[in-house]
């Protein structure tokens, strides 16, 4: 089996697709455990704490004898993906992707990846993954909702507009303040999950993709509202987040069922009740 010849399994699929992979993973890992080879399984998904889910699913499918040896030969590690990818739809085989920052992974015990470009080991991976929602996804959502308000179709257009940029920058500043305040992380750690200060070559990215599902993205614990709440509680400047949230409630896309549901609620009961509900 070809997969069993590799020391590192780097898996980049959606969480819901792992169920189709477990039989292959178990077969390959069984071969490697029997042969005494150590394996690092890197779970490249933005779902929080998903490596433990993958590990438990692998263990539940292993023979009892191999289960006892699992921890001696297999490590399943959490990662953070920091990239932007765009396609016309979810079945299109042509896509554009851009690495915004190095991907991050928990320190490995079984294999050396120090010479692999584009990935680095770091501690606090679960905290950083949670914070990425605020430091990266927050400004991105702010750019999308302000860009929609200004009549743009792509993030690229919004990035050239000072109105959109000012809101996204303010959201980014508050996110960094929240990261320092709530988790006491040093600036170099926060920079690993923040937009780079140097300009990178952009890819075409649609506002409809980034703005999709405003119900989730305007949730109380999500990318825009939670930092704003922390800002209110700690006398921080949350005005950029307030603007982004307000513009999010204006987002109206007929092709987005979540947007349609939110707009229907606003029309029926008014914005104040809609804000409380969503």
Language-model regions: role of each:
Residues 1, 5-14, 19-278:
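Substrate/ligand-engaging "lid" and interaction regions
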